[in-house]
Amino acid sequence: GKFSVFSKILRSIAKVFKGVGKVRKQFKTASDLDKNQ
C-alpha cells in the first residue's frame, strides 16, 4: 500500500545520499593529494 511506496522513496533517497557521500569522499582525497604535491 502507501507504506511500501513511502519506503521505496526513502530507500532511493538513501541511495542518492550514499552516492553523494562517496563522490564527496573521493573529491576530498583528490584535493588533498593535489595539496600534498
From Swiss-Prot:
Taxonomy, superkingdom: Eukaryota
Record has Secreted as a keyword: yes
Main subcellular location: secreted
UniProt keyword annotation of 4Fe-4S present: no
InterPro entries linked to this entry: Antimicrobial_3
Expression sites (tissue/organ): Expressed by the venom gland.
Listed name of the protein: M-oxotoxin-Ot2d
Taxonomic source organism: Oxyopes takobius (Lynx spider)
